[in-house]
UniProtKB/Swiss-Prot annotation:
It comes from Burkholderia pseudomallei (strain 1710b). Homodimer. UreD, UreF and UreG form a complex that acts as a GTP-hydrolysis-dependent molecular chaperone, activating the urease apoprotein by helping to assemble the nickel containing metallocenter of UreC. The UreE protein probably delivers the nickel. Keywords: Chaperone, Cytoplasm, GTP-binding, Nickel insertion, Nucleotide-binding. GTP binds at residues 25-32. Belongs to the SIMIBI class G3E GTPase family. UreG subfamily. This is Urease accessory protein UreG. The keyword Nucleotide-binding applies.
């Protein structure tokens, strides 16, 4: 009896490597919401896959699947089992492996989104893992958040300040937050958003396209 024949693994047909976009930020800031909106806003033009990080569950993967952000096979949940920061920075091997596995499944992916687990303002992505980093904070944390600094706020490629609609409810002054953000980030860009209302999502997409050279 002849041995079964299997199709050779698919090979990438596109010239440029996939763009890896890391999305970080504190718990509840809106990382998963941003990822959902980016997938829905870009999936018609680009081949997308997404990787989510949680400590003990795959809850964010489940939420994105239920929301219909992408087909289920294109969303991979990673259980880090420890500090979320470690899994994206000091020892990113679990996420690097996840990226590799997704690219075996979808070799022509244009963008790999990697959402970190909720962490503090010191969280950053390893350059081995992410080409672009987006850091999400929210107005509900108070107008003081931008001036607290930390690598996520000062060094990320794009800072997203989410939940601007809550400013009157928490006594936050958006002009003060914007001014403090410019002081902390210098020329680095930021976007004020209300992601649930899709306010600011187009600006984030434009940033990814321009900075990631997707429009060339």
């Amino acid at each position: 009896m002849n041995a079964p024949r299997f199709a050779a693994p698919a090979r990438r047909t596109k010239k440029l490597p996939p763009l890896r976009v890391g999305i970080g930020g504190p718990v509840g800031s809106g990382k998963t919401t941003l990822l959902e909106m980016l997938c829905k806003g870009m999936r018609e033009r680009y081949d997308l896959v997404a990787i989510t990080n949680d400590i003990y569950t795959k809850e964010d993967q489940r939420l994105l699947t239920i929301a219909g952000a992408l087909p289920e096979a294109r969303i991979m949940g990673v259980e880090t089992g420890g500090c979320p920061h470690t899994a994206i920075r000091e020892d990113a091997s679990i996420n690097l492996e996840a990226v590799e596995r997704m690219l075996v499944r979808f070799p022509d992916a244009d963008i790999v989104f990697i959402e970190s687990g909720g962490d503090n303002l010191a969280a950053t992505f390893s350059p081995e893992l992410s080409d672009l980093t987006i850091y999400v904070i929210d107005v509900a944390g108070g107008e003081k958040i931008p001036r607290k600094g930390g690598p996520g706020i000062t060094k990320s490629d794009l800072l997203v300040i989410n939940k601007t609609d809550l400013a009157p409810l928490v006594g936050a002054n958006l002009e003060v937050m914007a001014s403090d953000t410019r002081k902390m980030r210098g020329e680095r860009p930021y976007v004020m958003c209300n992601l649930k209302a899709l306010d600011g999502v187009a600006d984030v997409i434009a940033f990814i396209e321009n900075k990631g050279l997707l429009t060339v």
